[in-house]
Amino acid sequence: MMNKKIKRTLCGLVASLCLGGSTVPVFAETVDFDVTVPGDILSPRAAKFDSEQRFYVTGTLFNKTGRLDCRSINRTNSAIQSRIASISPSYLSSSALYYSNAPSGQTYYMTTSASVSYLRVKGRYTP
């Protein structure tokens, strides 16, 4: 009787470890950006490894007050784009949905425009 209980407990433990140990969390790559509008308006490229249909942008440094409008675009198929996410010194983080399915395993970049000239923003971008 005791042997049967131990076997059952061990089988349950092994099954739990197999299920829990085989799951791997999947994330999109996060890159730092430094853009100036007009001028250098593109972020570095970043790989998207998840299936979430939203991109994220966070500003960490603004050289002056203004709004930065950001859009995420698929590098190989520019028809795959996001809506605009806006950040400013008052609203440092934002996100926006993609208009169509943004597949994982591909590379994306962020393009920007601004409400004022010569706005320089540093921050992080996750496709």
Set out the residue ranges of the language-model regions.
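N-terminal prepro-regions of secreted/extracellular proteins
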Residues: 1-48
